[in-house]
């Protein structure tokens, strides 16, 4: 699963996702993409589940790019532990995704295959998404 090799600090604040995505809103690598429509934190497990669903449907043809990376440590305290005594330990890693952000890109496959692969991948994610494609020039 995806996670940073090392970080400057072990724990971070929750933070909020305001407005639309500042960068990563255009297709840079592939011809087809999956774009987020609403803000959410997406975990490394969800990214991996979506990637597996996409690559499994593509059957080793084409190429997949993951455009988001889980760099936010999410902490939690053990069950049945009283409040206080400091912040919990890091439980998992997540990526903040703002509306308009491209999460996955595909290339080297027909449009109908890409559309279905990204639909299956989107089913593994907790947000509404939209299929986009590069405009033929």
From Swiss-Prot:
GO cellular component, one term: cytosolic large ribosomal subunit
GO MF entry, a single one: rRNA binding
Subunit and partners: Part of the 50S ribosomal subunit.
Pfam families the UniProt entry points to: Ribosomal_L16
Keywords (A to Z) from UniProt: Ribonucleoprotein, Ribosomal protein, RNA-binding, rRNA-binding, tRNA-binding
Stored HAMAP family: Ribosomal_uL16
Domain of life (superkingdom): Bacteria
GO biological process, any: translation
Keyword Membrane belongs to the record: no
SUPFAM superfamilies referenced in this protein's UniProt entry, alphabetically: Ribosomal protein L16p/L10e
CDD domains (alphabetical): Ribosomal_L16_L10e
Annotated protein name in UniProt: Large ribosomal subunit protein uL16
Protein family membership: Belongs to the universal ribosomal protein uL16 family.
Function: Binds 23S rRNA and is also seen to make contacts with the A and possibly P site tRNAs.
Family annotation (InterPro entries): Ribosomal_uL16, Ribosomal_uL16_bact-type, Ribosomal_uL16_CS, Ribosomal_uL16_dom, Ribosomal_uL16_sf
